[in-house]
Amino acid sequence: MTIPKFKKYQLEAYRPGKSSIKKMRNIIKLSANESALGVSPKVKKILSNNKLDLSRYPDNKSKRLRLEISKKFNCNFNRIICGSGSDEIIQMVCQLFLKYGDEVIVPEYSFLMYRIYSKIAGAKVIFSKEKKFKISVSEIIKKVSKKTKIV
């Protein structure tokens, strides 16, 4: 019988942020995926359709979506990846391409999930400096090594 080897991750717990602005109400936090515009009227109309069947899980392989994308952009259906948001795509890329000891270069003020999924895969996260809060290609190139797998 094979016993799984458990991994211990050195990850900081996510703490949903509260706004430091005390005197304002109805603050919209874009970093928490809140929308300033609310639900689209088109989405509301579709969801109000009584014929819409929401009692089943959606197609987890996104076959219809991938087929439409392949038709629209004239590309191979089997080379299209869909996910439940950018998180899932980042997770898939890290699981597919990273192993323990690999390096991932991310800008210092980038999306938190890049470093979380990299660490889960056992990779070392290397931060590149930004210049005036913009990604600097030259700073990224300085960090590239033989262990770099993802930038």
Show the residue positions of the predicted features.
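N-terminal "arm"/small-domain region of PLP-dependent enzymes with the aminotransferase-like
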Residues: 1-56
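Conserved beta-strand segments of alpha/beta enzyme cores
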Residues: 26, 79, 124-126
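PLP-dependent aminotransferase-like
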Residues: 96-150
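Phosphate-binding glycine-rich loop
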Residues: 64-103
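A general structural signal for well-ordered alpha-helical segments in protein cores
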Residues: 40-44, 62-66, 90, 114, ...
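Conserved SAM-binding loop
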Residues: 58, 82, 106
